[in-house]
């Protein structure tokens, strides 16, 4: 899917985009607010315009990926079996036009062509214990942070919410940056320190075997600290420099790789409030965990717009992986029936216990191998109801026959979900600009590998033309 690039939009154009987004999201709120497990209990199919029902009814999953989501296979032509209503075409076009583009600006051969488990752009020691998705992420974000650090004259990088320290390790031992690594979980910090030691030994061995292949010079391992960072109060530890007293004052760059919920907001507030922090590179995630109010909206502009509210359901939907779901549709994966089965189970739960709504059902394994009545019995047991209740098999089979309708409705909601993410990230950019700073948003990861792939880059002085270097892929 194409979209709008945040980079290059003027401040006024960003404000107008916020106006357009709030209007569109308010117009389609009924689709975004719906829970797919209530497809049958709330007759969600009947809430769609009749002309939409006619256009979408009977489309199989691959057709939904191509025609509705607008994500055809390479070389595939988009052929509509009927004339779609203008209102549905308008929804599709609007969802595409107003969402921030998720396509990176670099065009290089895949780093996983030779081996799907090993990035060809990382040396073996940095790949150990790191999954392919994370290999891609730490390399791309680490290289951007290095460039941003050089451009802004930073003396220290602070990696907030660092987990097992994969990004910190690559930035310090791979790129030569001075890195402080903050993580609230002591167990993860101990694991990170163990992996640091393991990597140092591996690099020493590599240097002895291949002295010309390994960069010589001092190695700065990351400085790990067990520290919880609050979104509402300043963290003194975050601001403490690693340099010895007497040296020039530190210039800090804050970064966070998929900083969860309020943690992303904490990074923004530290950037705005602390003179020592001169740059920011943050990739957010888990928007449903944002405190409301407090973490959205942040900008005065969006707070003043009617319809700006984003309840939990909308923020949760913004965390789905559009590209991954489109691929599942193209493959017509058997697992697509899970939403239909769960919605059918909800009808039985409501009949037996009307006050029990949308209870959590722990993942039932191998759903695609079960008959719908078998799934329902297992589901009843998991929510504490009698699995031996007599079932209306004809009604369950009638629900199962509507599986493609369930998938179509879910696809509609997923088509709109990037607009919610766009509004959240746009709010953060406008907030930074309202404080007098400079903010841009870049698609940094391949969305097929990492769905939350937009990095918020902020500086306190304009980068000008130098900003374009952040978008390029290193050789």
From Swiss-Prot:
The keyword Nuclease does not apply. Residues 185-209 form a coiled coil. The chain crosses the membrane at residues 406-426. It comes from the Eukaryota. GO terms for cellular component: membrane. InterPro entries: Methyltranfer_dom, METTL25. It is found in: Membrane. It is a single-pass membrane protein. Keywords: Coiled coil, Membrane, Transmembrane, Transmembrane helix. The keyword Membrane applies. Belongs to the METTL25 family. This is Methyltransferase-like protein 25B. It comes from Mus musculus. The gene is Mettl25b.
């Amino acid at each position: 899917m194409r979209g709008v690039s945040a980079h290059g939009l003027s401040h006024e154009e960003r404000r107008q985009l916020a106006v357009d987004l709030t209007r569109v999201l308010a117009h389609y709120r009924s689709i975004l607010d719906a829970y797919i497990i209530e497809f049958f209990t709330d007759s969600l199919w009947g809430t769609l315009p009749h002309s939409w029902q006619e256009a979408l009814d009977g489309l199989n999953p691959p057709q939904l990926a191509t025609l509705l989501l607008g994500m055809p296979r390479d070389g595939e032509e988009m052929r509509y079996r009927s004339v779609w209503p203008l209102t549905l075409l308008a929804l599709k076009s609007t969802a595409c036009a107003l969402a921030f583009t998720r396509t990176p600006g670099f065009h290089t051969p895949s780093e996983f062509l030779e081996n799907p488990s090993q990035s060809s752009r990382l040396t073996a020691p940095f790949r150990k214990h790191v999954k392919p998705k994370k290999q891609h992420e730490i390399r791309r974000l680490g290289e951007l942070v290095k460039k941003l650090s050089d451009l802004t004259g930073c003396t220290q990088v602070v990696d907030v919410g660092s987990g097992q320290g994969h990004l910190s390790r690559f930035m310090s031992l791979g790129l030569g940056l001075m890195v402080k690594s903050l993580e609230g979980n002591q167990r993860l910090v101990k694991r990170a320190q163990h992996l640091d030691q393991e990597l140092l030994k591996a690099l020493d061995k590599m240097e002895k075997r291949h002295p010309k292949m390994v960069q010589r010079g001092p190695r700065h391992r990351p400085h790990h600290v067990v520290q919880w960072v609050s979104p509402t109060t300043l963290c003194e530890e975050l601001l403490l420099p690693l340099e010895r007293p007497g040296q020039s004052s530190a210039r800090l760059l804050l970064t966070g790789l998929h900083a969860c919920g309020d943690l992303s907001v904490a990074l923004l507030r530290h950037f705005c409030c602390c003179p020592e922090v001169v740059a920011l590179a943050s990739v957010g995630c888990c928007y449903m965990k944002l405190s409301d109010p407090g973490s959205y909206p942040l900008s005065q502009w969006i707070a003043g717009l009617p319809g700006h509210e984003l309840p939990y359901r909308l923020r949760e939907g913004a965390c789905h992986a559009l590209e991954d779901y489109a691929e599942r549709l193209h493959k017509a994966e058997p697992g697509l029936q899970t939403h239909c089965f769960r919605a059918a189970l909800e009808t039985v739960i409501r009949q037996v216990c009307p006050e029990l709504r949308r209870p959590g059902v722990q993942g039932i394994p191998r759903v695609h191998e079960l008959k719908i009545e078998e799934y329902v019995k297992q589901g009843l047991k998991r929510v504490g109801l009698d699995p031996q209740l007599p079932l209306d098999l004809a009604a369950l089979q009638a629900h199962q026959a509507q599986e493609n309708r369930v998938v179509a409705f879910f696809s509609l909601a997923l088509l709109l979900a990037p607009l919610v993410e766009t509004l959240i990230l746009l709010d953060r950019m406008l907030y930074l600009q309202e404080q007098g700073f400079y903010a841009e948003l870049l698609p940094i990861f391949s969305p097929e590998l990492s769905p939350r792939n937009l990095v918020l880059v902020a500086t306190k002085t304009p980068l000008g033309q130098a900003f374009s270097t952040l978008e390029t892929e290193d050789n």
